[in-house]
């Protein structure tokens, strides 16, 4: 063995440098949070549970253009459009999302011309059966009604970058 290797092993250089590193982090603030009791910050572009939004007058925003269905890479969205109404607009009769297939990429949200389908701030939506992850139009509208305030705030914060 060379002299420098003997000196390193006798002086425990690696052990001492590890202890110094550990002590440096010991006195810094914690980097973790106690999750169920503390919530971390979620930015305005956070992608959580899907929601269908309504206009302030209560009418649903979706115009049945089917762009979200076409762009979805996982083919998780199924839409059926109703007949045209007297004013020339269409609405959906069926809007289903298979949340098991969804990869939360946000492309449906980007493709929507009227901001009808969004990925909201909710990420705590665990279920016990697979069938509960098949969202229909009513479930999506309820999510939109429940999270509308946060969704509108996030869209407004992100608007300059769109």
Curated annotation (Swiss-Prot):
Intracellular or extracellular location(s): Cell inner membrane
A Gene Ontology BP annotation from the UniProt entry: aerobic respiration
Binding site residues for [4Fe-4S] cluster 1: 62, 65, 68, 112
Disulfide links within the chain: none
One GO location term (cellular component): plasma membrane
Manner of cofactor binding, per the entry note: Binds 2 [4Fe-4S] clusters per subunit.
Record bears the keyword Translocase: yes
InterPro entries tied to this protein: 4Fe4S_Fe-S-bd, 4Fe4S_Fe_S_CS, NADH_quinone_OxRdtase_chainI
Catalytic activity: a quinone + NADH + 5 H(+)(in) = a quinol + NAD(+) + 4 H(+)(out)
Assigned keywords, A-Z: 4Fe-4S, Cell inner membrane, Cell membrane, Iron, Iron-sulfur, Membrane, Metal-binding, NAD, Quinone, Repeat, Translocase, Ubiquinone
EC number: 7.1.1.-
Binding site for [4Fe-4S] cluster 2: 72, 102, 105, 108
Residue span(s) of domain 4Fe-4S ferredoxin-type: 52-82, 93-122
Gene Ontology molecular function: any one: NADH:ubiquinone reductase (non-electrogenic) activity
Membrane topology (UniProt): Peripheral membrane protein
Requisite cofactors: [4Fe-4S] cluster
PROSITE patterns linked: 4FE4S_FER_1, 4FE4S_FER_2
Subunit architecture: NDH-1 is composed of 14 different subunits. Subunits NuoA, H, J, K, L, M, N constitute the membrane sector of the complex.
Family listed: Belongs to the complex I 23 kDa subunit family.
Main function: NDH-1 shuttles electrons from NADH, via FMN and iron-sulfur (Fe-S) centers, to quinones in the respiratory chain. The immediate electron acceptor for the enzyme in this species is believed to be ubiquinone. Couples the redox reaction to proton translocation (for every two electrons transferred, four hydrogen ions are translocated across the cytoplasmic membrane), and thus conserves the redox energy in a proton gradient.
UniProt protein name: NADH-quinone oxidoreductase subunit I
Organism: Methylobacterium radiotolerans (strain ATCC 27329 / DSM 1819 / JCM 2831 / NBRC 15690 / NCIMB 10815 / 0-1)
Gene: nuoI
């Amino acid at each position: 063995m060379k002299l420098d290797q003997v000196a390193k092993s006798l002086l425990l250089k690696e052990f001492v440098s590890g202890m110094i590193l550990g002590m440096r982090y010991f006195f810094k603030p914690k980097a973790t949070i106690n999750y169920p009791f503390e919530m971390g910050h979620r930015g305005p572009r956070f992608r959580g549970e899907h929601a269908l939004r309504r206009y302030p007058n209560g009418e649903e925003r979706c115009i049945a253009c089917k762009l979200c269905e076409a762009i979805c890479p996982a083919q998780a969205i199924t839409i059926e459009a109703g007949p045209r109404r007297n004013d020339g607009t269409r609405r959906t009769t069926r809007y289903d999302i298979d949340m098991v297939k969804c990869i939360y990429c946000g492309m449906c949200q980007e493709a929507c011309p009227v901001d009808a389908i969004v990925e909201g701030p909710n990420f705590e939506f665990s279920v016990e059966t697979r069938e509960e992850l098949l969202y229909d139009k009513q479930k999506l509208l309820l999510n939109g009604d429940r999270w509308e305030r946060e969704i509108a705030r996030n869209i407004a914060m992100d608007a300059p970058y769109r």
